[in-house]
Amino acid sequence: MRSKASSRLLATALLVTSLTVVTPLAPVSASTTDAAFNSGTGALNVNYAGYLSKHDIVYNRINTNALHGLTVGNGRTGAMVWGQNGMTMQVSGVDLAQQSAYAAGLLNFTTSPAMDSSFSTFQQRLSLYDGVLTTKYDSNRTVTIMGSPNSEVMGIHVDDTRGGVSSVSVNLNMWDPNSVQNVADVPNLTTWRTVSTFANANAAGFSRGQSDPNNFGYTFAATVEGAGFTTQVVNGTQVRLNITPTSSYTIWFTAASRINSPGLNSVTQAQNQLNSVKSTGYATTLNNYKNWWHNFWARSFVQYSGVSGDADYMENVYYLSTFMIAAGGYGNYPLHFINGVFRATQDQTKWSNGYWYWNQRDVYNSFLASNHVDLLAGFNRLYSRNFNALRAYTQTRYGTDSLWVPETMGWDGNARGTINSDYVNDLYSTGTEAAYNMYLQYRYTNDLTYLRDVAYPYMREALRFYQNRLQLIDGKWQMVSSNSHETYWDVRNAITDLAAVRLLAPLTIQVSTQLGLDNGLRAGWQNLVDNLWPYQVGNGAYLPHDPPVSQTRNNENVALELVWPYDRTGIGYPDYQTAVNTWNVRPHPYGNVWSNDHAHAARLGLGNQTLDGMRTMLQKYQNYPNGMTNNTNGVFEYLGIHLTALNEALMQSYNDKIRVFPAVPSDSSFVGKFTLLAKDGFLVSSEREAGEVKYVGIRSQYGNQARVVNPWGTQQIQVRRTSDNAIITTVSANEVTFATGANTVYVVERTAKPLTNYTATTLTGTPNNGQKSLRNTASILGLNAGGGGGSSVVALRAHANGRYVQAANAGAAPLIASVTAIGPWEEFDMIDLGNGNIALRARVNNMYVCADNAGTNPLIANRTAIGGWETFALIRNSDGSVSLRAQANGRYVVAENAGAAALIANRTAIGPWEKFDLIPR
């Protein structure tokens, strides 16, 4: 989950961006008398182009902050784009390096005169439906960034009808290769610090990692279609394409991975890829690329709207998160939870040099329900392809012919990140999670071959590992010592181990019987189930291990693993109240960027808490207008777990029962609609408005038996086959079970108000054209046209004690309200950053004031540039005073201890100590 140096994790738990006051999203028009279900297709009628356009991310001013760059990718290669010296992007690829740790390089596109000179209108739009990033300057300049599907190639198409353009150039460059650190556990760091360039009549580029013993490495190269060009090597880390100005042309670029190249020759592969896409041409490639994304979106649908716009924002983040993960999720290796394919930090990564299962499951597990099992399959392949290596290492480490899976694993199954870490070196339950995800892949695809050849062997060997580790004491199988995930070390009967066995053993027995394999092993497995040590309960809630509670080492809510992803309890289970109690008293509410409290709330049917949890996570961690985070502990986890929470709020099938709208808000304005995939291949659709569920539509893909929880309690319902309107069954019960035919559509409806009572409709939306905000938080998506408005010189007088704030010790010490007169140490440049945000620069040392360590340390003037920690929302109070809210953590600045202590951003509300007079100088 995270590095051994966990102290920094807690320091960054609260990270929020600047306050922006924007009108909340308006709910999508809805009607309680219509329905969008298509009885022929078995899905909702959706105008996807129109509907998804309302979730486009729009920048109405040029963004020069690399960390706020918009993201575009084709599944294997991604680019993060911002405006700097023209248009700049950092290009990354999934398969370029171990754990995607090293990026490809920077691409800079410039013209003379500049593309962004002399314009009156500007808009940059990320179209989620098309997967295209379009930048328009007036009506005579458009830059379209897109990709070639199922390849590593992306393109920049330029339409520029201005006269007088004298030059156009594209630079591919690499940052200082000597700055590269071994963040990927590579065996040869020198080859990653070695750059080789080339330039010929057809393309130019450079390569790194060409001698990597693990066969990673890449070539970053570009060519041009539709215009003449020359190429040159500028220096040892930079190449350039000089393009003859014309009104329309396309720049193609690729990050060709060595490991996927014939003969490991990424230079030849890059040139072949560029020649191929150039031969296909821009128009055809763009059409193919759009169709690839259109087909992706057509596989599922969610609407989660209303509640004063809060739910709409959750829905926007849902689609944006889905896009960002999918845009890098189709490589040979999984999208890494930190590195991914979208970053603007060169080769700098955060803290992990491996795949951490907890974090990766956050990213991937939602894609079963959203009908993108192929994405989860890529995650599963990382573990299944290393099956033999992991078994061999299990024999070496534990002396048993079975399967232990390290929580922190390298691309090749190595456990170097696990065995030397106290957090994970005695963590045993990861193998069960990996095996269970493979089993679920079977349950959602009906792929019996995959079950027999891949999933079942994994299940069997992971269970046999537990047989080897458990000890029979006083007639009960017990785990004498292991980690209860990362939070409790070397404890007795970790709840994760007990849950793992209770999950895996019955399933393995069932599959063994189904396949007719390993009959002689089943009795031993059943003995585990029958005699396993019970979970421990204290004060009505599950304990993470046998008492007494061990020292807390991390901020996971381990006991709730029973709820998700171990699927051991939930709505309708005998221990439901115990599970709810466990959620209510969990020790670390939303404690980190990978927290899954809201997914647990959804599984427990806590609808209001689920919405509040999604909102809380975004308030804390969605800090940038592109949807990304400034959290130092992760990147993609909070996006992926948001998807899980929202899917589980709308539909659940984990316990082989289809349950619709189990955890939606109680607010009557909430509107929910979806088409999602349930276990056993049922495509489920339903709509809920004004508190009423209209119907449940089911398309059976494989002809399995369906079991549906009656969403109307025990009102009489019927199951109707839509092809001939035959009534399959009628019941007045809280569940209905019925046989289905493959590729056949059914409707579960009230006999008193069947689906035919509703008029048909198609869901659509209106294109977004501006910035969106999450009500009463600093989280925004997109940028308004307004910008900063200069600076002024001010002093601050604290209401707490009537004294002036000074940058003490000439700025070397924290800010404190301690002096009675204004001098050089008390003067600050107040810089208007736009959207109600400011920065303060101390005149005494010309340094910016920082809410240091994400706001956990006092304010101090010691930064040379403005970032998130140096940004404050300026709040003007009704009495004429002002307050400052730190972007770093969303807390108000206080003159602590009535001004006797340093200023610090740690208050959640404004009182006298949080007020200051702004004194112009």
Language-model regions: role of each:
Residues 461-511:
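Acidic/histidine-rich catalytic neighborhood
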Residues 31-67, 72, 76-82, 86-353, ...:
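Acidic/polar, glycine-enriched structural segments that form the non-catalytic walls/loops
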Residues 20-32:
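Sec-dependent signal peptide cleavage junction
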Residues 149-160, 680-707:
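Carbohydrate-binding surface patches
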Residues 787-921:
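Lectin-like carbohydrate-binding module/patch detector with strong preference for beta-trefoil
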Residues 101-110, 636-685, 689:
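Catalytic cores of secreted or luminal carbohydrate-active enzymes
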Residues 356-392, 412-413, 423, 427-448, ...:
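Active-site core of glycosidic bond-cleaving carbohydrate-active enzymes
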Residues 166-175, 697-713:
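Surface-exposed beta-strand/loop patches in extracellular or lumenal glycoproteins
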